[in-house]
Amino acid sequence: MEKITVLLVEDEQTLAMIIKDTLEGQNFIIHTAADGEEGLRKFFDLRPDVLVADVMMPRMDGFEMVRRIRQTDKQTPVLFLTARSA
């Protein structure tokens, strides 16, 4: 079975490592970025199968990053993460 490539964009390093370690034990190849600007660059370089993004990050938040991605890529599934309570 072919591994699924995931781009994880998360500014909290500890959380990013927990998620990465959990998913790498499954059928995923995980690439990480620390903020929306880095995530945007890596997305277009890697063309991952799935994008997992934090909502609130420095330099560019997850919503803005996905808005820019959606200008040219409307197919890649996106999962948003947030630590904010409702």
Where do the PLM segments sit?
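Active-site residues of response regulator receiver
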Residues: 54, 82
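Conserved acidic carboxylate
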Residues: 10
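Acidic catalytic/metal-coordinating carboxylates
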Residues: 35-38, 61-64
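Short hydrophobic/Thr-rich beta-strand motif most characteristic of the beta2 strand and flanking loop
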Residues: 27-34, 42
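Charged docking surfaces used in two-component/phosphorelay signaling
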Residues: 17-25
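Conserved phosphotransfer cores of two-component systems
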Residues: 44-46, 68-75
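Receiver (REC) domain active-site loop signature in two-component systems and cognate sites
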Residues: 57
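Active-site beta3 strand of CheY-like receiver
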Residues: 46-52
